[in-house]
A protein has these predicted regions:
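Membrane-interfacial terminal anchoring regions of lipid-handling membrane enzymes
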Residues: 1-29, 42, 65-67, 221-240
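Catalytic core of membrane glycerolipid acyltransferases/transacylases, capturing the structured
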Residues: 24-45, 53-56, 62, 68-127
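A generic structural signal for well-ordered alpha-helical segments
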Residues: 51-52, 114, 140, 172
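Non-catalytic C-terminal accessory region of glycerolipid acyltransferases
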Residues: 4, 131-240
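Active-site phosphate/pyrophosphate- and oxyanion-stabilizing loops and adjacent acidic/basic residues
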Residues: 49, 86, 169-170
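Generic alpha-helical secondary structure signal
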Residues: 17, 21-25, 108-115, 198, ...
Length: 240
């Protein structure tokens, strides 16, 4: 069965999704000329869902009713694998912008689509770059528009969670936005960092109660709280 699926993945699913990805990027680029909030989200949402379906990956969502669609949030999630992106894009159910590395914009077509969609490009190399990132975020995060961040900064190599960087929590506290921890479980088994081969399976997104901004909170405290909450819903062999 593994060999049959591998033939299906590389000879059928991957070529279809390559074409679909280019079409989605082009639709996003053109659509964002007219309405960035709509065309920067919905084409990619359905692209991500189709990507999961065609690769026989099921996404189960728990706790999404905790989210108010009129509120802007900072969503933070652990980063198990590439399918975290498809799971969040397709099944978050809330319009958002990614906080992503600026280098992604160098990818032909896809990079242009990300820029046109208004995703927040992170440049941490200079103080001015950080100020520009915060200014861009401030312009976007209102009226229910949210942001999604992987605080680890990269996919795990082992399945275990890495340390959290503070950027997302600094942003949340500075702008007074609630932070929503999301536990992603199953993505590492579907496609870990070390391979491009997909293993069909189930990914679970678990939404936790929003953590409201409090003036007494510091960045390290909120970061630690979110990491603890996210980790508690992971299997024991995925905890550090």
């Amino acid at each position: 069965m593994v060999y049959i699926y591998r033939i299906y993945q590389w000879c059928i699913a991957s070529p279809i999704m390559l074409v679909y990805s280019i079409i989605t990027a082009l639709i996003t680029i053109v659509g964002c000329l007219f309405n960035q909030d709509y065309w920067g989200y919905f084409p990619a949402k359905w692209w991500a869902r189709v990507w999961c379906w065609i690769h026989l990956v099921r996404v189960k969502v728990v706790g999404r009713e905790l989210i108010d669609h009129e509120t802007s949030y900072v969503f933070v999630a652990n980063h198990q694998g590439a399918y975290d992106i498809f799971s969040i894009y397709g099944f978050l159910g809330h319009n958002f912008k990614w906080m992503m590395r600026k280098g992604i914009t160098n990818i032909p077509i896809i990079g242009t689509a990300c820029r046109m969609a208004g995703h927040i490009l992170v440049d941490t190399h200079t103080a001015q770059g950080l100020r520009d990132t915060m200014a861009a975020a401030k312009k976007k995060l209102h009226g229910g528009m949210s942001i999604v961040v992987f605080p680890e900064g990269r996919r795990t190599d082992t399945g275990l969670m890495g340390p959290f960087k503070n950027g997302a929590f600094k942003l949340a506290l500075e702008f007074g936005l609630p932070v929503v921890p999301i536990t992603i479980d199953g993505s590492y088994k579907v496609m870990p960092r070390s391979t491009f081969n997909v293993t069909p399976g189930t990914i679970t997104l678990t939404f936790h109660e929003p953590i409201q901004h409090q003036s007494g909170n510091d960045i390290a405290q909120v970061s630690h709280q979110c990491r603890t909450i996210i980790q508690q819903d992971l299997p024991e062999d995925m905890r550090d």
